[in-house]
Amino acid sequence: MTLAEEFRSRNFSIYGQWTGVLCIILCIALGIANIFTIHVLRIVFSVLCLVSGLVLIFIEVPWLLRICPTSSKFDAFIRRFTTNYMRAVMYAIMSTIQWLSLLPGSGASSLIVAAVFLLIAGLFYALAGLKNQEFVGSKTLGGQGLVQMIV
């Protein structure tokens, strides 16, 4: 299945996964960009955004668990997020954390962009769950075809 066919399938988990890839890029970039500030609270939220981006890499690109040396506890933690609802909850939590970066003392920052896109990805996964769509991983990002080729 090509990338265009995946998008035409109208499976919201595919949309969620690709929005998640965008979230990875945004979380890592914005986490690094906002860490250089004098506001201590913003530094904390920047680190949380950076950690979120790194966790999302392993969740959204499954073949990385096979090629990167990680602990069995970390692998078990990542494998919890295989359903649409679990991913929706995870994205909602990550988004809420970034929305909290607007608290007084931290000031408004570009971390809000990460919060918005994390929320959108969570909504895609929630819609997939509500429509009873099975979680389908993109073949481009390491769906069943690529994982079987690596093994």
Swiss-Prot record:
One GO location term (cellular component): Golgi membrane
Xref: InterPro entries: TVP18/Ca-channel_flower
Superkingdom, natural source: Eukaryota
Transmembrane segments: 21-41, 43-63, 88-108, 110-130
Positions of disulphide bridges: none
Location in the cell: Golgi apparatus membrane
Name of the featured protein: Golgi apparatus membrane protein tvp18
Source species of the chain: Aspergillus clavatus (strain ATCC 1007 / CBS 513.65 / DSM 816 / NCTC 3887 / NRRL 1 / QM 1276 / 107)
